[in-house]
């Protein structure tokens, strides 16, 4: 397929950034207000996690003993997580929340979202407000909220982190995509450490300075690095992602004694 340059599909509405799309080869990408890629889909393999940050955001699977019953996504984008979860975690229910109706419309029309029903629902709402309705009944929260220029402020404030912690089940995990080059990055980390009582891990993505930051409702039962390596073997085979690379990234970026993490 010939390369198609970024083009505007929907004009900005109600203060939201305009939504655009581009295609290069078999990769279709979503943009918000600029040519920066926010989400991508492989047209031949729609469930593939094309962007490195989206793969890093699956690193939480290393630390869970039971597959999640429910996952909340704040920021639908092009539906990368929705497609992957529908394919690889088919028994997990998903709720995807996005404030921008244009993003939702384009994702439905052009990004092969899962069937909307009991297992997958889309909510048009402010994710920071919507998460307040949950009380200890969602197992994983995936946050990927950019406005085309930077992280959405409401999604990096302490009140939002507290609401997310209140929403998580007893062994729940919060995962967010941040950019390490943001001058406020360390401030965001300190807020998260405060709310989750130090149970935070950073996993750098393979490119572009993105970091998948994970925060844990309670200490993961398995923190032994050798045992996590064995778990990485099983996960890599099951899900087609490089969990050994993820584990190495976690080990290099977080305090440990070479044998255990300290969460």
Curated annotation (Swiss-Prot):
Catalysed reaction, written as an equation: S-adenosyl 3-(methylsulfanyl)propylamine + putrescine = S-methyl-5'-thioadenosine + spermidine + H(+)
Compartments reported by the entry: Cytoplasm
CDD domains tied to this protein: AdoMet_MTases
Catalytic residue list: 144 (proton acceptor)
Record keywords: Cytoplasm, Polyamine biosynthesis, Spermidine biosynthesis, Transferase
Involved pathway(s): Amine and polyamine biosynthesis; spermidine biosynthesis; spermidine from putrescine: step 1/1
GO molecular function, one term: thermospermine synthase activity
Enzyme class: transferase
Enzyme Commission number(s) from the entry: 2.5.1.16
GO cellular component terms, semicolon-separated: cytoplasm
InterPro entries per record: PABS, SAM-dependent_MTases_sf, Spermi_synthase
Residues holding S-methyl-5'-thioadenosine: 98, 126-127
Cited SUPFAM superfamilies: S-adenosyl-L-methionine-dependent methyltransferases (SSF53335)
Residue ranges that the Swiss-Prot or TrEMBL entry lists as coiled coil: none
Transferase recorded as keyword: yes
GO BP, sorted A to Z: polyamine biosynthetic process; spermidine biosynthetic process
Keyword Transferase belongs to the record: yes
Domain called PABS: residue spans: 1-221
UniProt similarity note: Belongs to the spermidine/spermine synthase family.
Subunit structure and binding partners: Homodimer or homotetramer.
Role noted for this protein: Catalyzes the irreversible transfer of a propylamine group from the amino donor S-adenosylmethioninamine (decarboxy-AdoMet) to putrescine (1,4-diaminobutane) to yield spermidine.
Name of the protein this chain belongs to: Polyamine aminopropyltransferase
């Amino acid at each position: 397929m010939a390369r198609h340059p970024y083009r505007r599909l929907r004009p900005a509405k109600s203060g939201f950034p305009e939504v655009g799309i581009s295609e290069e080869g078999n990769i279709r990408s979503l943009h918000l207000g600029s040519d920066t890629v926010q989400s991508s889909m492989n047209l031949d393999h729609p469930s593939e996690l094309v962007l490195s940050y989206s793969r890093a955001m699956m690193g939480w699977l290393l630390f869970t003993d039971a597959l999640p019953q429910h996952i909340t996504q704040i920021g639908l984008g092009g539906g990368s997580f929705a497609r992957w979860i529908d394919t690889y975690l088919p028994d997990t229910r998903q709720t995807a929340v996005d404030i921008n109706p244009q993003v939702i419309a384009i994702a439905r029309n052009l990004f092969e979202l899962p069937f909307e029903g009991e297992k997958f629902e889309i909510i048009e709402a402010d994710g920071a407000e919507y998460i307040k309705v949950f009380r200890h009944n969602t197992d994983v929260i995936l946050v990927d909220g950019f406005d085309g220029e930077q992280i959405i402020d409401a999604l990096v404030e302490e009140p939002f982190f507290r609401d997310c912690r209140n929403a998580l089940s007893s062994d729940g995990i919060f995962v967010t995509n941040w950019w390490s080059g943001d001058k406020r990055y360390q401030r965001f980390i300190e807020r998260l450490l405060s709310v989750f009582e130090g149970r935070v891990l950073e996993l750098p993505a393979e490119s572009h300075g993105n970091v998948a930051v994970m925060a844990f409702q309670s200490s993961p039962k398995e923190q032994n690095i050798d045992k996590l390596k064995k778990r990485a073997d099983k996960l890599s085979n099951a899900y087609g992602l490089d969990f050994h690379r993820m584990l190495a990234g976690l080990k290099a970026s977080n305090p440990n004694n070479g044998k255990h993490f300290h969460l």
